[in-house]
């Protein structure tokens, strides 16, 4: 397996240290961990260093060049001096007698593989900058309160960590019944009042900040036909702060599921510290043993944004857990669980799908081991994308030449391998994809008279050499 860069969020850390904000973030995290409340966060949010750090961070994102309803992007902010940027942000948030009023959010429908569309809300660039300022201050406060079972849109956490935890549940803990939950239109149906209460309970009690966040949630949406809609629920997908708000909403679910078993008072009260190697860990195994003699249902959650799975030991426990969690989500979070897409999977007999992977367990030497592969739908989608790009190699588009098309094709292949390399059957999946791609390339290159490929030095990147150096195709 190729070496992977484990230095997650290095740029964010370097930028924060450059603007002398990392120490502030660390203090916020520790205060939140100690249970303190925060009633004066706006001064930090509108501090010069935090605003300049926010600009630095969103500038590094390619999406910052996408214009909102005011037709402006990051280059319009970049044309101003640092002092002018700081002054403008402060004026937008606090300068008006009516308070902060974000401009309309541009609605754009993004096609999905199933033929449907995903509504994307693109705020104006100044509003995105303000959201980034807020996110930077709220994130360390929320991180101190978030559950370890949540992996999506969080610093130093990724799909890789979520899948490793999934493998642990199935192979080491033998929790083979998986409940696949689906919340109907989660981002479009977040209850605003519930969200504000959850923020308050996390210690975010600055009324000026709460006012600003309410205005962000209530920002009008400009539809493609030019009409304006005032939202009464939901957070716009595409907003910088939306993933953090989504995690705040579902954090309550994480802790509720954990309280049923993993963090149950019986397990915690019977736990004790042990030294394993050179590390001191809190061992709750004695409490878990006692809980198995009760009517409590063992359940463990793994969540990535609004996509989550709950693992159970038996089918009976899974059925009761599915009913209890569905009822809790609908009553407490005011969200609707899709009965058609929510199901219980016995991974000893069928595949369970999660984050683009399909997973099951198989018997081997009197135990069960994990077997994983790319989801069938994802294989089809990725193959179709590569086939289209292979056709572009044979007949380059007007704005590109053959070499650029090859480089784009290689980057797509690397992207697939980097994401799915955790699958145990990745080589089989890639072999099947490769077979179809080579058929297309062979046919196209033999028939397209205008296409002649030559081996030119210097067209292979260091990453490609490291990954495919021994391949005959290099």
Description of each model-found segment:
Residues 7, 12, 16-240:
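Conserved pre-catalytic core of RNA-dependent polymerases
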Residues 218, 227, 333-401, 405-407, ...:
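A conserved non-catalytic segment of reverse transcriptases
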Residues 232-235, 390-405, 417-428:
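Short, solvent-exposed helix-loop connector elements
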Residues 1-33, 266-284, 290:
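Intrinsically disordered, low-complexity and often Lys/Arg-enriched segments
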């Amino acid at each position: 397996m190729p070496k992977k860069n484990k230095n997650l969020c290095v740029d964010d850390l370097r930028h924060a240290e450059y603007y002398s904000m990392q120490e502030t973030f660390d203090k916020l995290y520790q205060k939140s961990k100690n249970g303190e409340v925060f009633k004066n966060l706006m001064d930090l949010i509108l501090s010069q260093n935090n605003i300049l750090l926010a600009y630095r961070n969103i500038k590094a994102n390619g999406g910052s060049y996408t214009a909102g309803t005011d037709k402006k992007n990051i280059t319009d902010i970049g044309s101003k001096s640092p002092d002018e940027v700081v002054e403008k942000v402060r004026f937008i948030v606090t300068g008006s007698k009516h308070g902060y009023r974000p401009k309309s959010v541009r609605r754009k429908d993004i096609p999905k593989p199933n033929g449907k569309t995903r509504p994307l809300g693109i705020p104006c660039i100044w509003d995105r900058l303000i959201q980034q300022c807020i996110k930077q201050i709220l994130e360390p406060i929320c991180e101190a309160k978030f559950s370890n079972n949540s992996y999506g849109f969080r610093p130093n956490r990724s799909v890789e960590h979520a899948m490793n935890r999934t493998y642990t549940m199935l192979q080491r803990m033998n929790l083979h019944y998986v409940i696949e939950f689906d919340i109907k239109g989660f981002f479009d149906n977040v209850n605003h009042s519930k969200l504000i209460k959850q923020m308050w309970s996390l210690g975010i009690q600055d009324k000026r900040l709460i006012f600003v966040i309410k205005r962000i949630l209530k920002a009008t949406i400009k539809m493609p036909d030019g009409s304006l809609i005032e939202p009464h629920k939901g957070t716009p997908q595409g907003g910088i702060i939306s993933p953090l708000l989504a995690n705040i909403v579902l954090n309550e679910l994480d802790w509720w599921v954990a309280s049923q078993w993993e963090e149950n008072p019986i397990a915690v009260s019977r736990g004790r510290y042990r030294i394993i190697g050179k590390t001191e860990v809190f061992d709750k195994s004695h409490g878990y043993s006692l809980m198995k003699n009760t009517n409590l249902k063992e359940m463990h959650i793994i969540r990535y944004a609004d996509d989550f799975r709950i693992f159970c030991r038996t089918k009976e426990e899974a059925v009761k857990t599915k009913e209890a969690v569905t009822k809790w989500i609908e009553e407490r979070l005011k969200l609707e669980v899709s009965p058609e897409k929510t199901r219980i999977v016995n991974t000893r007999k069928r595949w369970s799908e999660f984050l683009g992977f399909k997973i099951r367990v198989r018997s081997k030497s009197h135990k069960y081991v994990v077997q994983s592969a790319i989801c069938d739908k994802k294989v089809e989608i990725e193959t179709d994308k590569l086939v289209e790009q292979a056709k572009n190699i044979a007949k380059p588009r007007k704005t590109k030449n053959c070499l650029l098309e090859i480089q784009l094709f290689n980057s797509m292949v690397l992207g697939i391998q980097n994401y799915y390399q955790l699958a145990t059957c990745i080589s089989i999946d890639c072999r099947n994809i490769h077979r179809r791609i080579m058929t297309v390339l062979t046919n196209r290159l033999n028939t397209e008279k205008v296409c002649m490929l030559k081996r030119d030095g210097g067209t292979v990147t260091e990453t490609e050499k490291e990954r495919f150096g021994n391949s005959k195709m290099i």
